[in-house]
Amino acid sequence: MRRLLSSAALTLSFLAGQSADAASNDALLGDFFPYRDFQTLPSTRIDVEGGALEVAFAPGNLELPKATILEWVSRSARAVANYFGRLPDAQAKLLIVPVEGRGVRGGTTYGTRGAASRIVFGRATTEDQLTRDWILVHELVHHGFPNVGSQHHWLEEGLATYVEPIARAQAGELSAQMVWRDLVRGLPKGLPQAGDQGLDHTPTWGRIYWGGALFYLLADIEIRRHTENRRGLQHALRAIVSAGGSIARDWPVEKVLATGDAGTETRVLQDLYRKMKAAPGDVDLADLWRQLGVSMDGGSVSFDESAPLAEIRRAITAVAR
């Protein structure tokens, strides 16, 4: 199944009026991952805990040295492997396709013949832009969750939206303040609107990405409450990966949630899913931030370490034991 970022649908438009190299990349930017063509491209193997990521570049010039780009890929892959306890797919693939412009322009992840991600990469991208990029980690997080079908797409995209900044924070690439700032800004977009029928039945952009992320934040908090903060969502996801779950596998949603719950010895994922799948499940975010001890003034986040859930908040971005 194809996984798209909101910006990824724009990637084909970059081909219009491009050079011969860009035109030759048509087949590499289609609706499916070019598994066969990928094998014909020069590639580099990046070894990561639990496997390796094979990285190939489509034809086209890039201003940054490939060694710099590969170091960015390596950092991103290590952040994801650290979060899941290992690389979710031991033989994952990454295709980098140059286009005009700057920055990482979009990403797509597939599981048809193994976990594979494609990144659309501006030729004039700077090293600073790579340092601040979130898209590659978002795509690689998708590798660690089974394909559960279009009705449950919010479980897939919500997971990548929630886990990406936390994985980067645990790897030392992002501050805890930035993680919570983005959640405070983003989660209101995932709240139910008039006519909402629950996450399984309201496939809007806000509900798929940020409604899904809210589900996982609530699950993370509840798992930690049930286990006296010894375990969290991260342990549930590691259990799914340890059981063979990845984007290259089709699993019923019931199996995914039950496997995750087994990893925390709770029923939080299954119970929360039943609560939110077919009903709006509105959440008082202002009260949630108060309990977590998170407040934002302008663009700056501060923490109240005496808040009821401050210890849980700290544990979410700390390296898992």
What residue spans do the PLM features occupy?
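Structured beta-strand-rich cores of soluble
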Residues: 23-47, 75
